[in-house]
Regions:
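A solvent-exposed, acidic/Ser-Thr-rich amphipathic alpha-helical stretch
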Residues: 14-15, 27-87
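Juxtamembrane and targeting peptides
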Residues: 1-8
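Short beta-strand segments that buttress and anchor functional surface loops
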Residues: 91-97
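Hydrophobic residues embedded in beta-strands of well-ordered beta-sheets
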Residues: 88-89, 116
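Short beta-strand edge/turn micro-motifs at domain boundaries
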Residues: 101-128
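Residue-level marker for the onset of beta-strands and adjacent loop->beta junctions
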Residues: 77-78, 91, 104
């Protein structure tokens, strides 16, 4: 884990954001719109691997509709994290799902209640 200099508890915050990211990628979470929606910030937006910009409204339902609840899980490689400010973590990693690889970046924000929510996500398909 990497961190911004001088941030107390950086490793803990990065670990918590990573756990939330892994949850958001699990088949169980992706197949359950209510569960996924709890992880999305109300001002969530994404630049998907398709190049489309996606907002909060309807995202969880769309993901659930496209998720096979007994399907292949998303494989994650080389996840790294940076604490950008107290309660704000950026994650970078590579994913593979159904033969398709993508470089991914997520920005997570801790709420006043201590829960982590994803504010921004971008996926870029890689060649190979």
């Amino acid at each position: 884990m990497e961190q911004a200099a001088g941030q107390a508890g950086a490793d803990q915050q990065i670990a918590e954001a990573m756990a939330a990211e892994h949850e958001s990628l699990s088949v169980e979470c992706r197949a359950d719109p209510a569960r996924l929606e709890r992880l999305l910030a109300p001002d969530f937006h994404e630049f998907g691997a398709s190049g489309r910009e996606i907002g909060y409204v309807g995202t969880a339902a769309q993901v659930a509709a496209a998720t096979d609840p007994v399907g292949e899980p998303i494989r994650v490689e080389n996840m790294r994290g940076w604490l950008l400010a107290d309660g704000v973590v950026m994650l970078k990693y590579t994913s593979e799902h159904q033969g398709r690889r993508a470089n991914r970046t997520s920005l997570w924000r801790r709420t006043a209640s201590g829960r982590w929510q994803i504010l921004h996500h971008q996926g870029t398909v890689t060649a190979g």
